[in-house]
Amino acid sequence: MAPSGSGGVRRRCRRVLYWIPVVFISLLLGWSYYAYAIQLCIVSMENIGEQVVCLMAYHLLFAMFVWSYWKTIFTLPMNPSKEFHLSYAEKELLEREPRGEAHQEVLRRAAKDLPIYTRTMSGAIRYCDRCQLIKPDRCHHCSVCDKCILKMDHHCPWVNNCVGFSNYKFFLLFLAYSLLYCLFIAATDLQYFIRFWTNGLPDTQAKFHIMFLFFAAAMFSVSLSSLFGYHCWLVSKNKSTLEAFRNPVFRHGTDKNGFSLGFSKNMRQVFGDEKKYWLLPVFSSQGDGCSFPTCLVNQDPEQPSTPAGLNSTVKNPENHQFPAKPLRESQSHLLKDSQTWTESSANPGKGKAGMSNPALTMENET
């Protein structure tokens, strides 16, 4: 019992420590509000019109910054649905049999009705030993959260949360509004910073706040601009941070552009179809996080597919609908021999991509 108790104490201590970066950002944000709204706008600005304009614009950016930051922190990451979890009997088989063909057969049977297109580097079905589930496309296991996260991008210590399918849009808006917030502060604070620096204004308590505020805003603007630009590039290519470091592996091999549908569709996959919600931290992303449209460079004859533009869906035995996955239009000549998703009851003997490949081995990606 002692090790268990000490382990629980360590876990609680780690949970507390994980909040330190969030507390730091919150304190810095609170100080910046005091320094800008009080010391700069109310104390140092003499022009009433300038005060009003700066305070209105500042509070708008401040509100959007806090809102998007809050949503990024407290939106729970989405986990794979029950269709991807192994049944009790399948778990028993995996535990009873030695690793080998028996394990592969269990995974093949479990995955035959699931819309999974990606594989491990060795071509195996992506299976998580920790969560005991077959990983959906773009899903990864987070060692910090100790869960499989749908469309995991990365675990961010500054929000103490996993950034994935459920909150990636919020994270992007958080970066955007924090960058605008810092740029606005630096731009409107610059003239007062110069005047204090050259002793053009009296040496008051506001001097420290105004000068340090400019340094902090300028410093964060540089770091945020590079990070925001990088994630804009990721969105334009329909990649996650993990996929940028390691290209996704499909049945035919690696494909760095496997999920890219073109700039417009890539944007809409994150921000949604209704543009009125794009700048608001409300969930509007497309899909369910378990299945994603993909453009495959080469058609896999064993992999069922549906031409782009068709509204067909696939159903598993639990009546969970998954959208069909189109190929690139340049590969339309391959569609003549392609198969379509069918209900498991209609074709019980056929599996999904790679299910009949005896070379598949089970790996645990963490």
From Swiss-Prot:
Catalysis performed (reactions): L-cysteinyl-[protein] + hexadecanoyl-CoA = S-hexadecanoyl-L-cysteinyl-[protein] + CoA; L-cysteinyl-[protein] + tetradecanoyl-CoA = S-tetradecanoyl-L-cysteinyl-[protein] + CoA; L-cysteinyl-[protein] + octadecanoyl-CoA = S-octadecanoyl-L-cysteinyl-[protein] + CoA
Ranges of biased composition (kind: Basic and acidic residues): 326-336
Tissue distribution of the protein: Expressed in all brain regions.
Outcome recorded upon mutating residue 361 to E: Loss of localization to the plasma membrane
Result of altering residue 358 to A: Increased localization to the plasma membrane
Topology in membrane: Multi-pass membrane protein
The UniProt record lists the keyword Membrane: yes
Family of this protein: Belongs to the DHHC palmitoyltransferase family.
Protein name: Palmitoyltransferase ZDHHC2
Species the sequence originates in: Mus musculus
